[in-house]
Amino acid sequence: MTKYIYSILLSFIMIFAFVGCSDQQSAQGVSDNEIVLGMHTDISGPVSSFGKYSVEGAQMRIKEINDAGGIHGRNLKIIAEDHQYQVPRAVQAANKLLNKDKIFLMVASLGTPMNNAVFESQAEKDVPNLFPLSAARSMTDPLHR
């Protein structure tokens, strides 16, 4: 099951990496040799045991992808930010990932209120949110702009 999920993740990354990019313009977080992913999760708060393992799992899978040659010769890099399961910290973390780190996509971010709080910012930057760790309908229903 895990391999299936990561295969889907890899497929989405490959699709998003090249859709809408021309020779003169590249997507945020995509360079000739790297694709930057971001996640905000609970690393030191009340559900840190879950957050820490999600970061470690993502890092392990990304290492496997990079060891196999990356995606079209590009290595993946993931930046994980700790929101301590607090909405204001999640907003700060997402703003850093979007504006300073210039991530290509958000992946496996933990928490319904945290994901809901940053959806608008991500939409403004055209940064997809793949596999949010939440079961809320707002994570699966289409976003109406």
What are the functions of these language-model segments?
Residues Q59-I71:
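Flexible, small-residue-rich helix->loop connector segments that border functional cores
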Residues K102-R145:
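Extracytoplasmic ligand/sensor domains, especially the bilobed periplasmic-binding protein
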Residues I71-Q84, L143-R145:
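Short beta-strand elements in bilobed, periplasmic/extracellular small-molecule ligand-binding domains
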Residues M1-V36, D67:
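Short, low-complexity disordered leader/linker segments with a strong preference
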Residues V30-S31, I35-Q59, E81-V87, L110-G111:
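Extracytoplasmic "Venus flytrap"
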Residues I79-A80, Q84-F104:
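Short, well-structured alpha-helical segments in soluble
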Residues V30, V47, I71, R137-T140:
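Short clusters of hydrophobic/aromatic residues that line enzyme substrate/ligand-binding pockets
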Residues E34-V36, K77, D126:
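Residues that mark the start of a beta-strand
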